[in-house]
Curated annotation (Swiss-Prot):
<keyword id="KW-0963">Cytoplasm</keyword>
<dbReference type="InterPro" id="IPR002314">
    <property type="entry name" value="aa-tRNA-synt_IIb"/>
</dbReference>
<dbReference type="InterPro" id="IPR010978">
    <property type="entry name" value="tRNA-bd_arm"/>
</dbReference>
<dbReference type="GO" id="GO:0005524">
    <property type="term" value="F:ATP binding"/>
</dbReference>
<keyword id="KW-0436">Ligase</keyword>
<dbReference type="InterPro" id="IPR015866">
    <property type="entry name" value="Ser-tRNA-synth_1_N"/>
</dbReference>
<keyword id="KW-0030">Aminoacyl-tRNA synthetase</keyword>
<dbReference type="InterPro" id="IPR033729">
    <property type="entry name" value="SerRS_core"/>
</dbReference>
<dbReference type="InterPro" id="IPR042103">
    <property type="entry name" value="SerRS_1_N_sf"/>
</dbReference>
<dbReference type="Pfam" id="PF00587">
    <property type="entry name" value="tRNA-synt_2b"/>
</dbReference>
<dbReference type="Pfam" id="PF02403">
    <property type="entry name" value="Seryl_tRNA_N"/>
</dbReference>
<comment type="pathway">
    <text>Aminoacyl-tRNA biosynthesis; selenocysteinyl-tRNA(Sec) biosynthesis; L-seryl-tRNA(Sec) from L-serine and tRNA(Sec): step 1/1.</text>
</comment>
<comment type="similarity">
    <text>Belongs to the class-II aminoacyl-tRNA synthetase family. Type-1 seryl-tRNA synthetase subfamily.</text>
</comment>
<keyword id="KW-0067">ATP-binding</keyword>
<comment type="function">
    <text>Catalyzes the attachment of serine to tRNA(Ser). Is also able to aminoacylate tRNA(Sec) with serine, to form the misacylated tRNA L-seryl-tRNA(Sec), which will be further converted into selenocysteinyl-tRNA(Sec).</text>
</comment>
<feature type="binding site">
    <location>
        <begin position="264"/>
        <end position="266"/>
    </location>
    <ligand>
        <name>ATP</name>
    </ligand>
</feature>
<dbReference type="GO" id="GO:0016260">
    <property type="term" value="P:selenocysteine biosynthetic process"/>
</dbReference>
Length: 425
């Protein structure tokens, strides 16, 4: 969430930051409401100070021997009670106005860092580096063809069970999924991440805190009879692990890794990636999440990105790192690196991980602070996919495909899978 004080004190700067995302916003009404709220708070504080003085004066008079029923004391108490009524009215007005302001601010995305390249969309993203040697040429099959030939998955049965954009994995497909999850968790925990297995149902406050709501309500599955939603990413429950908390400074940084099923309606992707494992309503993902002190978040961003890259390197999958331009940033991010894995069958790079620094945006929405000495401040949060399991499987199938119809598995995965190749089932 954007800082209300910064909006009030320098709305033009915030408007320019949002304009870099392609949003034309007039913050004048919000600024006026914020100034009014500040005025109400000051007026209430003034009345409370007067009330405290009256209470003190009443106590002194009674202590000096004046009767509590005297006209003088009764008059003072009457004034005090009147002030309390005024204060109660002001408090209700403040609450209503503060709620209205928060509701408006929740709709605004994070401001891009000054270092973030300007641009409108993915076409303006900046390639930072690449790794590995992409397989290029004719004759490479797409992952869904390979998976069907090997008997790894069945989409028709999934439609019967649920609907389109779901997949059921069988035999080597199910084992490969499980192997990848365990492999990724082991690599990340060996680097100091604490493993978490969070709920897949989360409440509205958790989704608001991470920045998923209200923006992405139509993209999420909701349980209509409860205040619960199927989580679109483990980033949501991981953020809320410390919602409304003060984290002791000496405990920072906190690094979590979590495997979680993820659920998305994909409302805006009609006709895209209708086959295979790239775009599903339900998919598995391993998520990395950091809570850090503000001055170290940019350094942490490089580390969390490298940790996600390490998985691709160990799996021998060619990829590139792309810095997102201001117009392509996710809602909560101030800076993002996408890792895009090479798929020779599709003859293209596809996103497999998004590594974002959200600075204090999520922490302000979730009220997550740290305290060092007498100073309390918001933490910074970072997240990265480490990695999306289905897309990783797709990349392994396409990059490991052999002329005899088998798929060669990366050496690092063999101890987890138990065999060095996938064969027809």
């Amino acid at each position: 969430m954007l800082d209300q004080r910064k909006i009030r004190e320098n709305p033009t700067l915030i408007e320019k930051g949002l304009a870099r995302r392609g949003l034309k916003v007039n913050l004048a009404p919000l600024t006026e409401a914020s100034e009014r709220l500040k005025g109400l708070e000051q007026h209430r504080n003034s009345l409370q100070a007067k009330g405290n003085l009256i209470g003190k004066e009443v106590g002194q008079k009674i202590k000096s021997g004046i009767s509590p029923n005297s006209e003088e004391v009764v008059s003072l108490r009457s004034k005090g009670n009147e002030l309390k009524r005024e204060i109660n009215v002001l408090e209700e007005e403040e609450k209503a106005l503060a709620k209205s302001i928060r509701k408006r601010i929740l709709n605004y995305p994070n401001i891009p860092y000054s270092e973030c390249p300007d641009g409108k969309d993915e076409n303006d993203n900046l390639q930072i580096r690449n790794w590995g040697n992409p397989l290029k040429g004719e004759g490479y099959k797409e992952h869904w063809e390979i998976a069907e030939e090997l008997g790894l998955l069945d989409t028709e049965k999934s439609v019967r069970i649920a609907k389109s954009r779901f997949v059921t994995l069988f035999n080597h497909g199910a084992r490969l999924e499980r192997s990848l999850i365990n492999f990724m968790l082991d690599i990340h925990t060996s680097k100091g991440y604490s493993e978490v297995l969070p709920p897949v149902l989360v409440n509205t406050a958790s989704l608001e805190g991470s920045g998923q709501l209200p923006k992405f309500a139509e993209e999420s599955f909701k349980c209509s009879e409860d205040d619960l939603w199927l989580t679109p990413t483990a980033e949501v429950p991981l953020t809320s692990l410390h919602r409304n908390e003060v984290i002791p400074f000496e405990k920072l940084p906190i690094k979590y890794v979590a495997y979680s099923p993820c659920f998305r309606r994909e409302a805006g992707s009609y006709g895209r990636d209708t086959r295979g494992l790239i775009r599903l309503h339900q998919f598995n993902k391993v998520e990395l999440y950091w809570f850090v002190e503000p001055k170290k978040s940019k350094e942490a961003h490089q580390i969390i990105t490298a940790d996600a890259e390490a998985i691709l390197q160990k799996l021998e999958l060619p990829y590139r790192v792309v810095e997102l331009c201001s117009g392509d940033l996710g809602f909560s991010a101030s800076c993002t690196y996408d890792l895009e894995v090479w798929l020779p069958g599709a003859n293209s790079y596809r996103e497999i991980s998004s590594c974002s620094n959200c600075d204090d945006f999520q922490a302000r929405r979730s009220f997550i602070r740290t305290k060092k000495g007498n100073q309390t401040q918001l933490v910074h949060t970072l997240n990265a996919s480490g990695l999306a399991i289905g897309r990783t499987m797709a990349a392994i199938l396409e990059n490991g495909q052999q002329s005899d119809g088998t798929v060669k598995l990366p050496k690092a995965l063999v101890p987890y899978f138990g065999e060095n190749q996938l064969t027809p089932q």
